[in-house]
Curated annotation (Swiss-Prot):
Hemopexin repeats lie at residues 135-179, 180-227, 228-285, 400-453. Pfam families: Hemopexin, Somatomedin_B. Residues 1-19 form the signal peptide. Glycans are attached at N87, N146. It is found in: Secreted, Extracellular space. The modification Phosphoserine is found at S289, S378. This is Vitronectin. One of its GO terms (cellular component) is extracellular space. GO terms for molecular function: extracellular matrix binding; heparin binding; integrin binding; polysaccharide binding; scavenger receptor activity. The modification Sulfotyrosine is found at Y75, Y78, Y80, Y398, Y401. Sulfated on tyrosine residues. N- and O-glycosylated. Coiled coil: none annotated.
Amino acid sequence: MAPLRPLLMLALLAWVALADQESCKGRCTDGFIAERKCQCDELCSYYQSCCTDYVAECKPQVTRGDVFLQPDDEYRAYDYHEETRHNTSVQEEQRIPVLLAKTEETPVLKPEEEAPPPGPQTDDLGVPEEELCSGKPFDAFTNLKNGSVFAFRGLYCYELDEKAVRPGYPKLIQDVWGIKGPIDAAFTRINCQGKTYLFKGSQYWRFDDGVLDPNYPREISEGFKGIPDDVDAALALPAHSYSGRERVYFFKGKQYWEYVFQQQPSREECEGSSPSDVFAHFALMQRDSWEDIFRLLFWSHSFGGAIEPRVISQDWLGLPEQVDAAMAGQIYISGSALKPSQPKMTKSARRSGKRYRSRRGRGRGRGHSRSQKSHRQSRSTWLPWFSSEETGPGGYNYDDYKMDWLVPATCEPIQSVYFFSGEEYYRVNLRTQRVDTVTPPYPRSIAQYWLGCPVPDQK
């Protein structure tokens, strides 16, 4: 028996080492470790790679900082009509001196003189200047991996924050993306890499953190076989989990096509790139028991490639026959919950409204100053549930309050999709594929709710 003792000791040590490698004990803050057989990082639920004791050891929670509790255009909870009256009065106060100044500077024409015919204004290079609130239709919208929204119109592009256009925009598409505008469509994949695709004519370009990938542009017929050239709009959706497949909807004329990606990047492949905040927000929600809902929302019956076209107005109820642009909104949580006592709202609370965590600022050196004043409306009315990261119910800032709570089990995630047509936009519930019925109703003004343009005078 004596010779067996060393063998038993070795077997015991090997078992202990194996058990330690397959446990999250002491590993909850270590992040992803490729050499380990199972993982304890915050994305392991999505990749279905968690150790068996992940929940017990790491106690993951979907907390108030991980979820959005209203659609993109419903981030404020204080009274919509009061805000409208406030904005209108401010605009009237600011409009009077501007009009007077213009009146004083207008030259008086002599009888023999005639005013020159109106024409488009151009810059020194002969490029037509962009007018923010012109009401002209947009060509594309997309939500970049850092949470910023980019809008494309004609030769120009805009970066939008929660309230208006960011300082320094519009800029020429060619100066920012290296492509001469206009473009036809754009989308950003919702996976750990978060690459952005721009479409124009028969070609498409792919960008990683704003840098064009090698060997691009490519032909649409090669990279997206079965999808037509000159598309009008594109819309990307995530996979329900790592075992699922991502989808893109392409729209052209009165029809739309569904394209299914055959694979998504692995966890190891994403270690070398900056994380996608949009994807991280989605993946963190895998911690809760919403697998069935995610499968319902993001399931695809195709094994990859394009699916035969269908009619827009038949499947997306409430939309016009044709659309100019489309974009998936942030997933938000719908349901009932007890509201904590509401402290007095401060000015700083009203101004807060960050979409994603602090990594959002990691862009291509864009200005992120929020000092510019905006007339932008809240993009809709409100829901009396939770909050975005920095604002609680009613737009209140709870950063100074100790609040640790879980999303109630009765809640469920809602995926909104935005469609833009002409000077208006629609919000659609992906699960029902119907335009949301809210007040004020859809369609709504793009200029007012997305660009921060003044509210029209209400008589």
